[in-house]
């Protein structure tokens, strides 16, 4: 019998990967960078993403990373309600009803996980 299910957040509960890729490119283009196509950095960690975007200038990479995280991202938040997998809540509620424990495993920041949980209305089944 299944006792617990772990759900990944990005790409499973909420389709954020495409949004993150596009948001990063929009930021970089505002800074004068050009992309022939949007790089798919899905599943990469933050240091690897920024090294891929700015491979040759460590100081510029760090300045852009900080500005993106502290200014650009808060000004361009993830629209979780629009990107939420519509099966998230019903599946978790059904599992909970059957006595299966549910949890979210994610490398996302805790405040983002909490925001998703609130928007999805699933705090009571985790």
Name what the model sees in each region.
Residues 103, 109-126:
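Substrate-recognition "cap/lid" segment bordering the active-site pocket of phosphatases
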Residues 13, 103-104:
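Short catalytic-loop micro-motif centered on adjacent basic/acidic residues
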Residues 2-90, 94-98, 111, 123:
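N-terminal helical cap/lid subdomain that shapes the substrate entry/recognition surface
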């Amino acid at each position: 019998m299944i006792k617990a299910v772990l759900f990944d957040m990005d790409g499973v509960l909420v389709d954020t990967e495409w949004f993150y890729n596009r948001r990063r490119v929009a930021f970089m283009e505002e800074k004068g960078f050009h992309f022939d196509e949007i790089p798919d950095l899905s599943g990469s960690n933050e240091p690897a993403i920024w090294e891929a975007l700015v491979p040759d200038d460590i100081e510029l990479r760090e300045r852009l990373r900080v500005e993106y995280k502290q200014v650009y991202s808060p000004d361009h938040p993830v629209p979780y309600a629009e990107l939420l997998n519509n099966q998230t809540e019903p599946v978790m509620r059904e599992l909970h009803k059957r006595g299966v424990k549910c949890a979210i495993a994610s490398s996302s920041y805790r405040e983002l996980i909490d925001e998703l949980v609130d928007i999805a209305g699933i705090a009571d089944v985790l």
